[in-house]
Amino acid sequence: MAAVDLEKLRASGAGKAIGVLTSGGDAQGMNAAVRAVTRMGIYVGAKVFLIHEGYEGLVEGGENIKQANWLSVSNIIQLGGTVIGSARCKAFTTREGRRAAAYNLVQHGITNLCVIGGDGSLTGANIFRSEWGSLLEELVAEGKISETMARTYSHLNIAGLVGSIDNDFCGTDMTIGTDSALHRIMEVIDAITTTAQSHQRTFVLEVMGRRCGYLALVSALASGADWLFIPEAPPEDGWENFMCERLGETRSRGSRLNIIIIAEGAIDRDGKPISSSYVKDLVVQRLGFDTRVTVLGHVQRGGTPSAFDRVLSSKMAMEAVMALLEATHDTPACVVTLSGNQSVRLPLMECVQMTKEVQKAMDDKRFDEAIQLRGGSFENNWNIYKLLAHQKPPKEKSNFSLAILNVGAPAAGMNAAVRSAVRTGISHGHTVYVVHDGFEGLAKGQVQEVGWHDVAGWLGRGGSMLGTKRTLPKGQLESIVENIRIYGIHALLVVGGFEAYEGVLQLVEARGRYEELCIVMCVIPATISNNVPGTDFSLGSDTAVNAAMESCDRIKQSASGTKRRVFIVETMGGYCGYLATVTGIAVGADAAYVFEDPFNIHDLKVNVEHMTEKMKTDIQRGLVLRNEKCHDYYTTEFLYNLYSSEGKGVFDCRTNVLGHLQQGGAPTPFDRNYGTKLGVKAMLWLSEKLRDVYRKGRVFANAPDSACVIGLKKKAVAFSPVTELKKDTDFEHRMPREQWWLSLRLMLKMLAQYRISMAAYVSGELEHVTRRTLSMDKGF
């Protein structure tokens, strides 16, 4: 559907009623989804009902079904679990139970149902929808409802959102709750690492995932675990010997700890369970290592949702409401999923069918097929884990030397990218150098060769272990060229922010003057500002958004306690408003001022009046975000003075400048993983390019496509030549001319109850799940 006009949209919701429920196991981010469905529903003029206690509340009716207003879902976005309750319901699996549920929905005039839950809950919803007509006939026959009512409510629309920490649903890159569960697992691994190192221990960590190894796989990849057990890929026979050999080997190389990660559903080739206690006993008996088991259990479901889960849930929930409004008698029940950074609608039963096929493949011991059916990203994660976990000597030494450096400001995930690039390069037989202190270090000859074990333990470290500088190559080209010649460097991998991109562009433009610069170059965008052209996500921006979000959560709590207080919070990001916008959505801010969305004094007046109106309700707190360079004259101090003066007698005002807090401590699971993947993919690309341009015993690369930025664009990882990106770059303000996340600002304003035109909102199309669509790697 094309963009929708606000008036038409508001009319399309009028007279409709939407019921929202959470079912099955809880997942962090469900509250953000409930909030967004409720507010979007009310926004378009529909009535919204919160159905408490999942399907149980639907069957029992009464007080469990309550009409919601705008304030019903205030201040819940930061809470874990689900505030409307969830239950596993036996009654709904029977025809009588579903008949009672249909009766309760008709009583409230609800014919649109948004179900947030796992595949079981969504399958139940689809059965309910297919039986709807016959259930109403039975209710008419019993005299419980009139024929007129049955005609009025003759059709039930279903839109599903997948809430499950296991990420076990086919057709979506991420389910609601998965990212937060990974946060909990990584927090535990980081904490365990310090005690394990102190005592030279081995830890066996058991994570959730009875039928799906996603959490185990990604946390193993993000922590550099020594061994991994997942149900989709049982270990080869004789694995006990291999595992003990590998653990012994890492210890003999000086490592003080071993980490083994096991999914609770891990099995061997014969389908027999492998338990964490069995693995522990094995290590103790064979190696005599001090070994402990930690079962994470329900810790993984707990805690506050991560920024990714809050934004993902809000985006999907808006799309679900649109899907319900646009549904006709012929549209199938759909589920809203994530593909890259796009929300997509898929037929519910196609996804459920594919999900069941994975299980069937595992039951039939077709394990390779099971991994393929899990999707391209899962398969890619698995292959990268196998590549990086253990050093295998290269088949042959190559003649190539590569150098890796960090440029710009420190960003979380830089070290993960360097580690994986170093190890991939070594496994391909290349000589790998690291350069300290960016281009300046390259000019001064601060270059050293690096080995496999030199980068051990780098994954979870924040900042930049190599040291990073903002200096560009321009003033020191002679010295840089000299050192490239001395060390015989054939390729450069530059991990960094806008300066990394600009620096490589300068080197490429100097190729005509210096033949030594006719080498292969690649930029991995790493900056908290997310302002590098050629990618939708820069490394480090997820950690920065989470750091800003945690600070804002605390600030909001302070405002709640004080009553009638507004906080103005300044975020970093240069001219790029990504941090302010995404943090704003994640914390439910009232406004976020950014450079890309120009505003004038009239807009500020509207905002202040909006805040004054808000203070008359039960929500007596406000939070306004401001990007540091959003306006030359409307500074943070100006906004503080304006809000203080206009709000006099109604609310008072305080400011907070978050500053370098936003560079974050330890990288988030997303950044560790994304960095690891970009490092591997960039190194594989460099290796391939080097082979292509190797002529007569030397490397000569001068084609535009020999110097690229690697990044995630929409649904896939892409390489864009720096010379082609030049025309798409605003060098004055250091950012791309077009930015995908500006479409998220509609959601920010709508959820803060601003009247806006939805003309720019583009709904997701209904697509289909096939083995081909599953095979794409989206980088998650």
UniProtKB/Swiss-Prot annotation:
Co-factor requirement: Mg(2+)
PROSITE patterns attached to this UniProt entry: PHOSPHOFRUCTOKINASE (PS00433)
Residues noted as binding Mg(2+) in the record, renumbered to the chain: D119
Annotated region described as C-terminal regulatory PFK domain 2, given as residue ranges: 401-780
Residues reported in the UniProt entry to bind beta-D-fructose 2,6-bisphosphate: 470, 527-531, 565, 572-574, 628, 654, 660-663, 734
Cellular component, GO, one term: membrane
Glycosylated residues (UniProt): S529
Annotated compartments: Cytoplasm
Record carries keyword Cytoplasm: yes
Alphabetical GO biological process terms: canonical glycolysis; fructose 1,6-bisphosphate metabolic process; fructose 6-phosphate metabolic process; glycolytic process; response to glucose
Ranges for region N-terminal catalytic PFK domain 1: 2-390
NCBIfam families in the cross-refs: 6PF1K_euk (TIGR02478)
Record-given protein name: ATP-dependent 6-phosphofructokinase, liver type
Biological source species: Pongo abelii (Sumatran orangutan)
Gene that this polypeptide is encoded by: PFKL
